[in-house]
Amino acid sequence: MGATEVLTSYCVVLCLLQMVALSSGHFTVIGSQRPILATLGGNVELNCQLSPPQQAQHMEIRWFRNRYTQPVHLYRNGKNLHGETMSKYVERTELLTDAFNEGKVILRILNVTVDDGGAYHCVFKDGEFYEEHITEVKVTATSSDIQILMHTPNIKGVMLECHSGGWFPQPHMEWRNSKGEVIQATSKFHSQDKNKLFNMSMVLFIEASSHRNVICYFQNLVTHQEQSINIVLSGELFSWKIVWIMILSTISFVMIDFCMTYCVQQQLIHEESLSTVDNDQCESDQSEGTCYKRNYPWIIIAVVPIISVFAIIGVMLFLHLEQRVTILEQHFELDTLWLEDISVILCVVIVSNINLIPLIYFRLHEHVPRFKDRSPILNKAVVFLHFIYFSIVCGTILLVHLQLRNKVSISDSLFSLYNSWLTDISMILGFLLSIFIVTTIAKSSLFNKKWCIGLCIHMKEAEATGGPCEGEEL
């Protein structure tokens, strides 16, 4: 036997052994080692093949997920058995058999949903022998629908809300400035709809005009796709600061101007009275209880507007720093609206009660003669009326509070806001009541001393002329 015949015999034996091995079902299944990305609503193809390549038409090919008995797609005896597949995959899968001769199959899944994500088992079965390969599918959805909602600017600042829906999986979201630097979000929220898609929302509360260009940024953590939208904030949105500074400055300027004018007037009257009144006589009258030597009136007069300014500043700071609701709560905007309205009302109340009402009162003293001899009674009446007025207001607040307790449940967040406001207003009214009474008494005391000096002058003139002074008034 020659060498050629020996080599030929060896090749024949090797081929026979290979055919025996193939007929006995010795093979492996290979496929993609990386996750397959599937776009939501699109189609995805999963492939696997035999190694070594061989005919697969006579084999059973099964694709399943968690349970072997619940196939996604089943091919057996040369047919696709759709009746044995999972109901949600009926008419949604196709098995591409163009490369059956090479042992390669492709499963196409149509109209991908969020539930299609996960592991898929590809099984080739030849007789009793089978092998499988596992392919992972990741479903992704990226949305370009991003909206920024800007709430009405209020006394505390500007609130921005960024919304975007239709994401999967949950994306990364953040606020950025024009330089790409991250701005800490006030809050972040997310929810899932019936299709298990994520609806994202985040809030940014800007208290100052430091961020003029704000970017709402989203990123899909699987595909690394990015979506963003920006908003440019005008400086006019923060004009509320200038408005409030102008209001407080105007109030302070008016009160200080009134104070200075009135102080100069009273000082001139004081100096004129000192030049005509015998100090010794007034001191003797003072010892008898008929006259009081007047001190410099501008000290008391100057204290009143100063108290007014500090009262306004104190009340405004108290209302603004008091945290009745957090920014994240649904009634935050309602709280800021009430804060704006009540701040204006309190400014008017403080200015009118501390300055306007006493001014009218003292003008009546000067120009209506019958008020002069009743000044002590009127002084007490003013204080009493202040007390009655604030008592009525506090009583009304208490009644409203009791009615709210009966109408609104304790767990209601709106009731908590009402209760906080009622408590704060009650404290402020008590504080203002004490301020009003003190300023009224101070001004009344000043007026009595002024009237006393006038009486001393009149008595001095009556004594010099020899006429009677009893019962006469100035």
From Swiss-Prot:
Location within or outside the cell: Membrane
Recorded GO CC terms: membrane
Keywords assigned: Disulfide bond, Glycoprotein, Immunoglobulin domain, Membrane, Repeat, Signal, Transmembrane, Transmembrane helix
Domain Ig-like C1-type: 141-234
Membrane disposition: Multi-pass membrane protein
N-terminal signal peptide: 1-25
Ranges that cross the membrane: 242-262, 299-319, 342-362, 382-402, 421-441
Extracellular side, ranges: 26-241, 320-341, 403-420
Domain Ig-like V-type: 27-140
Record carries keyword tRNA-binding: no
The keyword Transit peptide belongs to this UniProt entry's keyword annotation: no
Broad class of the protein's primary localization: membrane
Glycan-bearing residues: N111, N199
Domain of life: Eukaryota
SUPFAM superfamilies: Immunoglobulin
Cytoplasmic side: 263-298, 363-381, 442-474
Tissue-specific expression: Expressed in skin, thymus and, to a lower extent, bladder and testis.
InterPro entries per UniProt: BTN3A2-like_Ig-C, Ig-like_dom, Ig-like_dom_sf, Ig-like_fold, Ig_sub, Ig_V-set, IgSF_BTN/MOG
Family matches, as Pfam families: C2-set_3, V-set
S-S bonds: C48-C122, C162-C216
Miscellaneous notes: Encoded by one of the 11 copies of Skint genes clustered in the D1 region of the chromosome 4.
Family affiliation: Belongs to the SKINT family.
Function: May act by engaging a cell surface molecule on immature T-cells in the embryonic thymus.
Name listed for the protein in its UniProt record: Selection and upkeep of intraepithelial T-cells protein 4
Source species of the chain: Mus musculus (Mouse)
